[in-house]
Amino acid sequence: MNAAITATAKYLPDGILSNLDLERMLDTNDEWIRTRTGISERRILRDPEKATSYICGEVARQLLEKRGMKAEELDLIIVATMTPDMLFPSTACLVQDIIGAGNAWAFDLNAACSGFLFALNTGSRFIESGAHKKVMVIGADKMSSVIDYTDRSTAILFGDGGGGVILEPATTEGCGVLDNRMYCDGTSGKDHLLMKGGGSLHPATHQTVDDHLHYIYQDGRMVFKSAVTSMANVAVEIMERNGLTAENVSWLVPHQANQRIISATAERMGISSDKFISNVARYGNTTAGTIPICLAELDEENKLHPGSNLVLCSFGAGYTWGGVYVKWQ
């Protein structure tokens, strides 16, 4: 039994932080940012009283409405995020409360930018095993809460937002989440993309705050090299494992980190520009939110049809990376 995606949804906050705004804050300019990243603006959840659970709640309500489902019908909620409201309880538990899904158990999963694919794979297993019938998977991050807006190497990249899907048993033979490849390399990744403060190694103190340890640190050059290679490799691997070609892949749905990485992945796959989705110019990198936001936009624009072949791929901190093959139901 395969797991099929039966609903999609996204939420982007109204606040916009443009490249021109960043010009006034940092030693940077619009042309420099667009040339290196492809990003023109990003969304920001400005209300300090609203956190990642708010984004997830908005996504969850839409998913239920689109599917015509009651919250009580859900068996499981998985939230992929690296910016939870709190260390505990999990953001997924907060979402369960927000939507009133009293019969669902819930947990968070943190694989940074790869989080949604890891969560999608995990949720699919519960459907495939027959343990559950209705699983909600959400990827969301309030990245503005962990960005140092005096550091142009990271401030230009990230935005807030999220998206999600509902998984149910496929009703069409040969459709659903059909294959995946997930990878991790803690040896290479542990020093190049991280946030040092706030965990048990460096608990929050005046010193950790003064030292900016509660913000993302990224060695941009090293991360870029690894991301370009890993995302392209896993996307090609998914194609080869499943007999897919550039002609019969309907959509490449890549993590939206950087337009150059997206384009390099498509080029390795032989995919033309009309077969991959890119919204990084409008939203920046929403981390765990990028791929489900892309899926929701494709769905809203009626670009997903029964039998469409989708290759999803991502790369994130850890390092973590992966690819998923979905045949749309």
Swiss-Prot record:
- Positions of the UniProt region annotated as ACP-binding: 256-260
Q: Which family does it belong to?
A: Belongs to the thiolase-like superfamily. FabH family.
Top-tier EC class: transferase
Query: What's its EC?
Result: 2.3.1.180
Q: Name one GO biological process term.
A: secondary metabolite biosynthetic process
What species is given as this protein's source?
Chlorobium phaeovibrioides (strain DSM 265 / 1930) (Prosthecochloris vibrioformis (strain DSM 265))
N-terminal signal peptide: none
Protein name (record): Beta-ketoacyl-[acyl-carrier-protein] synthase III
Keywords in alphabetical order, please: Acyltransferase, Cytoplasm, Fatty acid biosynthesis, Fatty acid metabolism, Lipid biosynthesis, Lipid metabolism, Multifunctional enzyme, Transferase
* UniProt xrefs under NCBIfam families: fabH, PRK09352.1
Domain notes per entry: The last Arg residue of the ACP-binding site is essential for the weak association between ACP/AcpP and FabH.
According to the UniProt record, one GO cellular component term is: cytoplasm
